[in-house]
Amino acid sequence: MTAPHTAYDFDAPGLDGSLQPLSQWRGKVLLIVNVASKCGFTPQYAGLEQLWRDYGDKGLVVLGFPCDQFGHQEPGEADEIRNFCSLTYDVTFPMFAKVEVNGAGAHPLWKWLKAEKGGLLGIDAIKWNFTKFLVGRDGKPLKRYAPTDKPESLVRDIEAALA
């Protein structure tokens, strides 16, 4: 297998367990986020959903990847995650099965994203839930955002990527 060149070269299991190739969103702008249901940043689900609703028809796809590596803040199984997101934040953007984003067991997409767009001070590791990666229509990462960056603060970059 050749080394991945774009985000579209990866796949991951959805919350329903079915394999979801990211190539189904080829040519779209992707906002890839590690999410959690019991985190201080969990209210960002509302902002992520708003971005999806405001820009989805213009070519943005928000992709949520639950992760339980930070303070055991995503302890639920797939059904619990789905129900929480739907009932609490009316999430309709694509959600995936739980992944690891750091360490030897990190999902290959997340290993690649970190290698392509390292964090502050050259430290690649994901620091906490709700780290975000904006990926351009060409499948290449444009920018990495910290958990403290609220979804609405990404609008200018998203609009530029969609232009």
Regions found by a protein language model. Give the residues of each.
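Chalcogenol-based redox active-site neighborhoods
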Residues: 1-163
